[in-house]
Amino acid sequence: MLLNDREIKELIDKKEIIIEPFSYEQIQPASIDLRLGNRFRIFRKGEIEVIDPKDFKDELIKIEQDENKIIEKYKYTDVIITENPFIIYPGDFVLASIYEYIKLPRYIAAQLHGKSSIARLGLIIHTSAGWIDPGYEGHLTLEIFNTNNVPIKLYPKMKIAQLQLFRINPVERDYKEKGGKYYKEKGATSSEIWKDFI
């Protein structure tokens, strides 16, 4: 059953659902607004010939920091922004994180959707992974794609997504207990699909 605003508020007040930081203004009639974090992960163009899901580990090879706080990795470049916008160019794909930390109980599942105002700019905020299992905990990763023919500026803490919450019968084993790959993820987290081949 999809939760309404009253039920969402009640579960947050009881600390059954944890969203931090949180303001009651984020509660919509049947969802919660979520904001964009400040961590982005970008594929390093020209350095990857092909992606092999069996061997997609993101091995750290070097770290460089300057005033823009850029950290270099093998397959990605990590960018942490503070006040300036992050610009996503036409046809670009980036991983980003949600600002809020989320924790769901074993009887709540969730679905993540882009906000309509964001979609009308030509921005897809999750290319396919919108489902969140009961027991999830962490900062959700967004898979952002610019379908527009012009660049789009993204600002830290701007409203970017809506989280719908569904009450279900309590699961036998939740996301944590099943060893979910992205349990307690922080920042924009790379694919760990290679673990499916072990």
UniProtKB/Swiss-Prot annotation:
HAMAP family with a match to the protein in the record: dCTP_deaminase
Gene: dcd
A Pfam family this chain is assigned to: DCD
Keyword Nucleotide-binding recorded: yes
Top EC group: hydrolase
Record's catalysed reaction(s): dCTP + 2 H2O = dUMP + NH4(+) + diphosphate
SUPFAM superfamilies on file: dUTPase-like (SSF51283)
Keywords: Hydrolase, Nucleotide metabolism, Nucleotide-binding
Binding site for dCTP: K115, S116, S117, I118, A119, R120, D133, T141, L142, E143, Q162, Y175, K184
Stated family: Belongs to the dCTP deaminase family.
Positions of the record's site feature: Important for bifunctional activity: G130, W131
Record EC number: 3.5.4.30
Subunit structure: Homotrimer.
GO MF term list: dCTP deaminase (dUMP-forming) activity; dCTP deaminase activity; nucleotide binding
Function: Bifunctional enzyme that catalyzes both the deamination of dCTP to dUTP and the hydrolysis of dUTP to dUMP without releasing the toxic dUTP intermediate.
Pathway(s) annotated for this protein in UniProt: Pyrimidine metabolism; dUMP biosynthesis; dUMP from dCTP: step 1/1
Active-site annotation: E143
Name the record gives this protein: dCTP deaminase, dUMP-forming
Superkingdom: Archaea
InterPro entries found in the cross-reference section: dCTP_deaminase, dUTPase-like_sf, dUTPase_trimeric
